[in-house]
Structure formats: C-alpha cells, structure tokens
Amino acid sequence: DKEIENRFYTDLSFGTAGMRGVRGVGRNRINNYNIRKATQGLANYILATTGEEGAKRGVTIAYDCRIGSTEYALNTALVLAGNGIKAYLFESLRSTPELSFATRELKAQAGVMVTASHNPQEYNGYKVYWEDGAQIVEPQASGVVNAVNSVDIFTDIKMITEEEAKAKGLLEYIGKAVDDRFIEEVEKQAINRDLPNKKDFKIVYSPLHGTGRVAVQRVLKEMGYESVYTVPEQEMPDGMFPTCSYANPEDKSVFKLSTELADKIGANICLANDPDADRTGIAIKDDNGDWYYPNGNQLGICLLYTSPSPRDA
C-alpha cells in the first residue's frame, strides 16, 4: 500500500530550519513521537554545549492555531523538563515574533515555535531558535541537527508528567507579562507616531485564522488607530483555515474577504498575516480605485524609504 509506504519508508527530516510535514501516524509524519524526538535532540545539544547554565536558563515555547499545536507544545515542554531543562510555555497561542522576543526577554537558552507557517492545513512543524531570538545558524544548526538525528525514538526519550514538571519548577506558563513587554517594544519601533487623522484612518485587518489577532489589534489601537475593522470570518483561530486553503498573505486570493469589507466601509488599505504572524501582506487602492497587491520586495523598499537615514538616527 503506497500510503503506508509513504508514512514509514523514511524518517521525517530535521534540518537547519527545523522540521515540517503532514500530521499523522508514521515515521515520516508530524506527530507526538517525532516532536519528542526533536526535543530530546535539542535537550541533548543544550546539555552538551551549555550544561547546567543552559538548563537553568531554559527554553521558551510558543505555538500557533494549527491542529495539534497545543499538544505538540506541551510534549516539547515535558521532554525538556524530563531532561532537567526549564520550559517556559505560553498559556495560549502566540506569534513567532513574540516567541523570538520572549527568548531574549527571559534570557532563555533557546526557543521552540510549533508552526508550519503558511503551509496547507494538514501540515504542522517545529522551528528552533537560539538565545539571540533568531533561528539557529552555524555552529548550533549542525549541532542540533546531528543531535536530533542521533536520538532513538523508542529508547532515548526522557519525559515526565505535567504535574511533576510543575512540582519540580521545570514548567512555567507565561502570558500577559511577556505580552505587555512585547507590545511595548513593538510600539517603540514606530517611525512616526503623530500621523494626522490616524484616529479616523480606516484599516481592514485579517489574521487569516491565526495568531496575529493577539498582538496586531492591540498595537494598532494603542497607537491611536481606532478605525480598524477585522474580517469577522477570519478573526478567530481555526487550524482548518476554512476561508483560505493556502493562508499566505503573499497570495492575493486571501484578500478576497478583506477587500470586500474594505469596499463596503470605504477603506483603502488591508493588512493580513500568515498563521504564525511572521509574514505580512497588504492590499492598497491605486489612483484608479483598483486593488493593488505589493510584493515583499516592494514593501521592503517602502519601509526603507520611510525609515530614518543613518544620519538622522
């Protein structure tokens, strides 16, 4: 049977960008067993390279809206705890940028984000970050990959219960305090906080069923943008992504509901995030009143153009 062969013919690859695959039973699928294997490898690498200090500093863990993400994140925390490594687990879904921030803010040794970014709904994944809040690069990348690939999934996993991890002080749930610090730092990055008429400037926003709603709505409101309209059909987290089979804000098809709402209320700009909110796309109306969808390169140029020059900084 080809389906059985595909599930078991090889191990799910863990590379420098972590691992990503279809959820399901099998060696070649994302499931609790492969999540535990990846985490055991990460734990082995942390203990081998940073020792007791790294164990005390711990690992931050966040997860997105995808099916299985909550369970995979808890499994990650309990394997780390089983190895004597402190786990800081977000109490509910958070974005990848906030995971990066939390890793630095809590001075953790590493971070783990359970997500498959903008892949179709049947996927999930696991990304590893280092103490600087960035995805692992050399020499950590090769070290973690080799450590993960050396783990025997049946005999090497060290894991304890949630109750035991809490009792030992090896599992700490995090949330509002980190959120507040994250939002504070995000708001400091504003280039111009005193734009005229921003209170009445209409913006349509969509998190595409993902994590963006946790921070984006709050940031815009606190920055004085009071006329923000979130697409109701896409506001709540939903790992099935019922309104968009491919939740990538670089794909203009995901803006269909956003532009319809914008036309209805008279807005000229729409913003959207992918499920883990580390990617943003926009739609804007051109001089003819038609919707235009700048690509990432064009957005980068606009950001560079509006940023202070080194002489102004």
Predicted stretch roles:
Residues 305-313:
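Single conserved hydrophobic/aromatic residue that forms the stacking wall/gate
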Residues 34-41, 98, 181-185, 254-257, ...:
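Well-ordered alpha-helical segments embedded in enzymatic catalytic cores
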Residues 1-76, 172-200, 211:
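An N-terminal, well-structured beta->alpha segment
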Residues 3-12, 124-254, 261:
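Gly/Ser/Thr-enriched, mixed-charge loops and adjacent short helices
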Residues 137, 290-304:
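Gly/Ser/Thr-rich active-site loops/lids in small-molecule metabolic enzymes
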